[in-house]
Structure formats: C-alpha cells, structure tokens
Amino acid sequence: MKYVKLMLSQVVVSLGIALVLNASLGVFPISATNLALCGWLNVSYGVANLLSELMMLLYAMYRGERIGVATISSCLLGGFIVDFFTSILPTTWLLAPIGIVCLPLGYGLVGSCGLGENASCMFTTALQKQFNKSTKFVRNVMEICFLIVGLLGATSSITWFSVVLSLGFGTVMGTIYKIIGYNPTEIKHSWLIFRK
C-alpha cells in the first residue's frame, strides 16, 4: 500500500508543477532552473529535471542523507510525468493556486510514505540539519537560489509570479507540512543505499 501511496503522491507533485507551468504566470523557481538547463543543454524538461535532481541528490548524500524508493522514482519519473501533464492540461492562470498547493502537499505525502524523499526534499532536509533551520527558511533560500540560476539562463518564463513564489513557497510548504503532520527531519525512512 505504501508503494501505491508513493506513486500517487509523485503524481500530485508532478501535477502541481505542471499546473503552475500551464498557468503561464511564471514558473516555480526550481522550474526556472530546469528551464535554464533545457536551454543550455538543449534537452527536454524531463531530462533537465533529472539532471537537477541528481545534483541535489549528490549534495544530500554527501551530507549524509540516504536514497529510498521515493528518491529513485522521483528522479526517474517526476519530470516525465510533468511533461505528460503539461501536454494535456489547458493553459489558464486559474491553475496556479491549485499547483501551489499540490506541490508541497505531494512532497509531504511522498515523504510520509517512509520510503525516502525526492531529491529536492532530501536537499532541503540536508540543509535543515546542516544549518539547524526550519523548512520555511531553508526552502525560501533555496527557491531564491533556483530563481537566480533561472535568471542566468535568461528564462523568459520568470515573471513577478516566480519572484513571489521564490519569497513565499517555503512558507506555503512549511504550513502544509504542519497541516498534514509531516516533519522531514524526524520521520524514519526505509533506505535502499547507505544504511546506517
């Protein structure tokens, strides 16, 4: 049952990203980074997402986080599920609020499965432990950094909406985590690699 919940949760994460992309108001800062990678490397969003997830994963592993089934499924499937949803969803700004809620809800649901976290959440957790800061603080700093990388890639999808997301997504994420009772630094996961 945990694996079914994991896959459905990964769909919620990818749906959240796709909803914001198709809202055409701007993109999540991490999506700005992925879009910059698309331009620099001439690859699809799915491939760019895989590359950025791998970079975050390597840092998180360096800091002592471990890989679970959720980590693997996120890296291998997440961006491609986004590709699918963006191809079938309508383009309207009304999708943005739903996407802003779906993404952190999906992140929390993935983590609560106890099968590991996706790479960006592992990265967040590693930074939380390293600097002893809250999800809200760490994620807001991460989002600002992702936005800067996106700006360096001259991503035309970055708008006022992306800036607002970079300043407030960590707050939304922290709030949703509290609502669903998920604390990433306290949950015990089943790991595939680097067991202690």
Annotate each language-model stretch with its function:
Residues 1-196:
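Core subunits and conserved enzymes of cellular information-processing
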